[in-house]
From Swiss-Prot:
Localization per record: Cytoplasm
An annotated GO BP: glutamyl-tRNA aminoacylation
Function text: Catalyzes the attachment of glutamate to tRNA(Glu) in a two-step reaction: glutamate is first activated by ATP to form Glu-AMP and then transferred to the acceptor end of tRNA(Glu).
CDD domains xrefs: GluRS_core
Record protein name field: Glutamate--tRNA ligase
Organism annotation: Moorella thermoacetica (strain ATCC 39073 / JCM 9320)
Motif ('HIGH' region): 10-20
InterPro entries listed in its UniProt record: aa-tRNA-synth_I_cd-bd, aa-tRNA-synth_I_codon-bd_sub2, aa-tRNA-synth_I_CS, aa_tRNA-synth_I_cd-bd_sf, Glu-tRNA-ligase_bac/mito, Glu-tRNA-synth_I_codon-bd_sub1, Glu/Gln-tRNA-synth, Glu/Gln-tRNA-synth_Ib_cat-dom
Reaction(s) this enzyme catalyzes, per UniProt: tRNA(Glu) + L-glutamate + ATP = L-glutamyl-tRNA(Glu) + AMP + diphosphate
Residue interval(s) of motif 'KMSKS' region: 251-255
Quaternary structure note: Monomer.
Length: 490
């Protein structure tokens, strides 16, 4: 294979959608697998919808995911600039060449005229295509129309017969009859190129070898091939990756939950989990595993293992994968990532005093096995940082309503108060001794204690919680719970 050069070319008209992130990832993986070049280009010719905020957000999302680009904004490269809005002269030059060679023409039809002709064609049962009337204008016709003050667009003169074949590396050959393709606009009357024109020129000048993009772009590809041919450019390879659908097989949208990378980041998902999950949307690894290190994905990635069939987006699986990376990730890194979520809930000061870091780290080590996102860390860990003022209702019914529950907590409190050393092992030994002496099961003692000191019925090991909270806090919470039982359940 010749030198691989691929690109991801988002439009800065919104956040980086999860589908766009998957396309970027597949391009990045293909480049890394082949020791090629991954180019980031910003297709910002839609001046009405493109914003600086979206541009910055896309770059931030790409950086957060770890999809580093070799050429592009903030990196530069020999084929820049990498924003289409800074390349307009290149497009104008090539459009002028097509006009001079008779491969494109000026069209003076107004929006109103085109709309009326479309309505008429539909009423007569004809395809609502442009009727090519400006294709054969005489110089005198053009002069007259320009004198009327009409601002022309430029249309490509599409062959009226024959077939344009997309040789797709995933879908095989896909044929389009030229008779069904409009003489489409390549330059708008406002002096801006259309997507199907500008992208061809950029991909050619940037020496892109493979265009890997979403299936919804397949219908644009014959038009782009016609532009390649008109400009006498060599064709790149095309690969259209499958659509991503919601579980009900509808188009993925906000009603199915988060759809942008930024939203997932803010909900506490880890970039490595999103990368792992997105890689599996349409691509199959060599084995059956679902947790795959990035190095292994790069090593195995190929377009031959990309499916033609739509991928079903399963948030539950993403969340499960995220839970794995939370449990297995470097504890200091997970702690740093969790801090903003704890601070946003008012559980920790911002900035965190350095003296408190080890305690927070230990708490996260205790709770991370039972959470799936960083946002869940804040909820799971809250009682380590704030007083327990409420108890779970099901826990109250099951554990606090037992006869003698308050007295049992009092006895447990006294045992803990007299321990020479207060740690998990000593607390557990004291509790087991107390349960044995009273002839009750350990659960009858452990469960009400957990509820008393955490407000929860589930969580980390009871004695791990005790050691982290410390003797003073544990005793105070046992006192409060016993008092609450007497005041509310007596």
């Amino acid at each position: 294979m010749n030198k691989v050069r691929v690109r991801f070319a988002p439009s800065p008209t919104g956040s980086l959608h999860i589908g766009g992130a998957r396309t970027a990832l597949f391009n990045w993986l293909f480049a890394r697998h082949h020791n090629g070049t991954f180019v980031l280009r910003i297709d910002d010719t839609d001046t009405e919808r493109s914003t600086e905020a979206s541009y910055k957000e896309i770059l931030a999302a790409m950086g957060w995911l770890g999809l580093d680009w070799d050429e592009g904004p903030e990196k530069g490269g020999q084929f820049g600039p990498y924003l289409q809005s800074q390349r307009l002269e290149l497009y104008r030059r090539e459009a002028a060449r097509l006009l001079n060679e008779g491969k494109a023409y000026l069209c003076y039809c107004t929006v109103e005229e085109l709309a009326e002709r479309r309505r008429q064609a539909q009423a007569e049962g004809r395809p609502p295509m442009y009727d090519r009337r400006c294709r054969y204008l005489t110089p005198a016709d053009r002069t007259r129309l320009e004198q009327e003050g009409r601002q022309p667009v430029i249309r490509l003169a599409v062959p009226e017969t024959g077939t344009t074949v997309v040789k797709d590396l995933i879908r095989g050959d896909v044929a389009f009859e030229n008779a069904t393709i409009d003489d489409f606009i390549i330059f708008k009357s406002n002096g801006m190129p259309t997507y199907n024109f500008a992208t061809v020129i950029d991909d050619h000048l940037m020496q892109i070898s493979h265009i890997i993009r979403a299936e919804e772009h397949l219908s644009n590809t014959p038009k782009q091939i016609l532009v390649y041919q008109a400009l006498a450019y060599e064709l790149p390879a095309f690969a259209h990756v499958p659509m991503i659908l919601a579980p009900d097989r509808s188009k993925l949208s906000k009603r199915h939950g988060a759809t942008s990378v930024e939203e997932y980041r803010d909900e506490g998902y880890l970039p490595e989990a999103i990368i792992n999950y997105l890689a599996l949307l349409g691509w199959s690894p060599e084995g059956e595993e679902e947790i795959i290190p990035l190095e292994k994905i790069i090593e195995q990635f190929s377009l031959e293992r990309v499916s033609k069939n739509a991928a079903i987006y399963d948030t539950k699986k993403l969340t499960w994968i995220n839970g794995h990376y939370l449990r297995e990730g470097n504890l200091d890194r997970i702690t740093r990532l969790a801090l903003p979520f704890l601070q946003a809930k008012g559980l920790l000061p911002d900035p965190l005093p350095e003296k408190d870091y080890n305690y927070v780290r230990s708490v996260i080590a205790a709770v991370r096995d039972r959470v799936k996102t960083l946002a869940e860390v804040a909820d799971a860990a809250s009682y380590f940082f704030t007083d327990v003022t409420n108890y779970e209702e099901k826990g109250i019914r099951k554990h606090f309503t037992r006869p003698g529950a308050a007295a049992l907590l009092d006895e447990a409190r006294e045992r803990l108060a007299t321990l020479p050393e207060f740690n998990a092992q000593a607390a557990e030994e004291a509790y087991r001794s107390l349960a044995e002496g009273k002839g009750i099961s350990t659960g009858q003692l452990f469960h009400p204690t957990r509820l008393a000191i955490s407000g929860r019925t589930m969580g980390p090991g009871l004695f791990e919680i005790m050691e982290l909270l410390g003797r003073e806090t544990v005793l105070a919470r046992l006192d409060r719970a016993a008092r609450w039982i007497r005041e509310n359940l007596a």
